[in-house]
C-alpha cells in the first residue's frame, strides 16, 4: 500500500505538468462524481483506512470540532445506507467543502514513523 506522502508527491507532480493535469483532472472529477460518497455526506478523507498506527495517530491529533464533524458525517452516511437513500442536493457535500482535513496530520505522523524506524535501525560504530 502506498503511503499518503507518496500519493501527495505524485499528485503535486501531475498538477505541475499541464499536459498530465489536463488528462488526469477530468478523470479524477468523473471518478469522484461516480463514487457517490459526497451524496452520502462524506468527505474524501473519511474514506481512508483507519486501522493503521499512522492513521490512528493522525486521527487522535484532530481538533475536537473536526472529530465531532467527522463522527456526524459517519452517522449520516450510515443512516443513508440503512434507508437506501441519498441526501438532498442542498445537504450533500459540495466539491469546495471536500477539503483534505486529515492529510496534514497523516503526513506528520508518517514523517515521525519514518524517523522512528530510522532511529530504531541505527548502528553505532565501535
Curated annotation (Swiss-Prot):
Cystine residue pairs: none
Compartments, as annotated in UniProt: Mitochondrion inner membrane
Topology class, membrane: Peripheral membrane protein
One Gene Ontology term, aspect cellular component: respiratory chain complex III
Keywords per UniProt: Electron transport, Membrane, Mitochondrion, Mitochondrion inner membrane, Respiratory chain, Transport
BP-aspect Gene Ontology terms: mitochondrial electron transport, ubiquinol to cytochrome c; mitochondrial respiratory chain complex III assembly
Pfam families: UCR_14kD
GO molecular function annotation: ubiquinol-cytochrome-c reductase activity
Binding partners and assembly: Component of the ubiquinol-cytochrome c oxidoreductase (cytochrome b-c1 complex, complex III, CIII), a multisubunit enzyme composed of 3 respiratory subunits cytochrome b, cytochrome c1 and Rieske protein, 2 core protein subunits, and additional low-molecular weight protein subunits. The complex exists as an obligatory dimer and forms supercomplexes (SCs) in the inner mitochondrial membrane with cytochrome c oxidase (complex IV, CIV).
Function: Component of the ubiquinol-cytochrome c oxidoreductase, a multisubunit transmembrane complex that is part of the mitochondrial electron transport chain which drives oxidative phosphorylation.
Family as reported in the entry's similarity comment: Belongs to the UQCRB/QCR7 family.
Designated name of the protein: Cytochrome b-c1 complex subunit 7
Gene: QCR7
Amino acid at each position: 500500500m502506498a503511503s499518503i506522502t507518496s500519493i501527495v508527491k505524485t499528485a503535486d507532480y501531475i498538477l505541475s505538468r499541464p499536459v498530465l493535469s489536463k488528462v488526469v483532472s477530468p478523470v479524477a472529477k468523473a471518478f469522484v462524481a461516480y463514487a457517490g460518497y459526497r451524496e452520502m455526506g462524506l468527505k474524501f478523507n473519511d474514506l481512508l483506512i483507519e486501522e493503521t498506527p499512522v492513521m490512528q495517530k493522525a486521527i487522535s491529533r484532530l481538533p475536537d470540532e473536526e472529530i465531532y464533524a467527522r463522527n456526524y458525517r459517519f452517522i449520516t452516511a450510515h443512516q443513508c445506507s440503512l434507508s437506501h437513500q441519498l441526501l438532498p442536493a442542498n445537504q450533500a457535500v459540495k466539491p469546495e467543502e471536500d477539503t483534505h482535513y486529515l492529510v496534514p496530520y497523516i503526513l506528520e505522523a508518517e514523517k515521525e514513523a519514518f524517523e522512528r524506524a530510522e532511529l530504531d535501525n541505527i548502528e553505532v560504530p565501535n
